[in-house]
Amino acid sequence: MNFSDVMREESKWTKTENGADAKNTTDSALLDMFATIGSMRNRSEDEIIQKFELAFQEDPLGAMRCLFWARDCRGGAGERRVFRVLLPYIANKHTDAMMKNLNSIPEYGRWDDFYSLIDTPVEDEVWERIKLILDTDSILMEQGKSCTLLAKWLKKADASSPNTRKLGIYTAKKLGMSVYDYKRLCVKLRRYIDVVEQRMSANEWDTINYPAVPSRAMMNYRKAFARHDQERFDEYLNKVQSGEQKINSSTLYPYDIVEKILYGHEDSKVLEVQWDNLPDYVDGDVNAVVMADVSGSMSGRPMATSIGLAMYFAERNKGAYHNLFMTFSESPQFVTVKGNTITQKINFISKVDWGYNTDLEKALLKILDVAIENYCSQEEMPKSLIIISDMEIDCCTNQKHRENFYDYVSRVYDEHGYKIPNVVFWNVDSRHDVFLADKDRKGVQLVSGQSASTFKNLIGCVDKTPVEMMYSVLNSDRYQAIQI
């Protein structure tokens, strides 16, 4: 290896916030994007754009599919900000790629994502499509048939927010309508598709069809429903608990519920039934353990995400590790989930020892120590360890110079006669580029985000490399509509 090769290799190394050696790339720009895009809510727009552009140069189709996976609120990461940061950039820099995928925007996201494309080369095409859909919805409404939710997400020309009102007036202009006609049509369509906010504004609380209220609206308005329509709302929730009625939870994430209990100290029947009705992405008996980072750097939403995902998986896993997970900070602990309600369970977990360190080394070696002390065979070990963290781990005790974290832990397991289980590094708060394994490490997967739907992608990927797992997601049937 000549000096330039050494320099090139050295440029790939960085330090975590706690001083551990780590890579700043997986050696695949697309994987760098996939492994962080679900957890980049607090990164700058320039960082987000640079990451996408490098991925696009490496694999244009993969980058576009990763973009829509990131936005996908049902099967993907459900990240709105990152998607809206990238839409205008792609429309300006890769216009053809954006034009070919315009129709997919409301399929994976929402109709109001289109507003991010104002003042770009595809804006005229956007308004043509919106006008066509709006005209079609008007006809379908007159015929008493089902129509889209476009009217729900079009900006109101009489909104209280100046920016929203400005966009609403602009929308009317671009659709060739007077503000009055635009407002009248939107109100008519919103009432027809039964947008719950319309009934709330009209003080028609006793006419709200609670089983039809969308997931996030039910969460956001739960206190208003209880305040204005208490008897009927309580009756509805009791019927949900008994299985007579349904409640929508499909677009919620575990942290949505956990943070309201963990930080808001709320004990709500709505949160209880929505937790119970989250989509189940865990396929029965799964031989895996979640390791939840509860260190100081995870405070706020990342902590709620870590605890929420760990509880979600432990509850729904019907195998040997049902209701079991592990926390790690200064001292790793095995946790058995206790309690009858989600509030009781979170209150119990909040009493577990949460420290300020991020000692992932100690946590992974505790798994090894337990196996050694109890003479466990390889077959008795968990098949997979799912590590949910910001990846800002502590410096390891015996890690060699320029030895990546996964390679170090794998070496320690080997020295004691064990093979390290499959490891998933799940990043929930990517503050800068830190990767604990590269793209070719067999038995490692790199994922990101807050969504429990990621579990379904992990179940069948044990022993795959990070790149293999990524492409199993991006090239799945769900993203075949995205083309270049």
Summary of predicted features, one role per range:
Residues M1-T305, E315-I484:
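Long lumenal/extracellular ectodomains of secretory and single-pass membrane proteins
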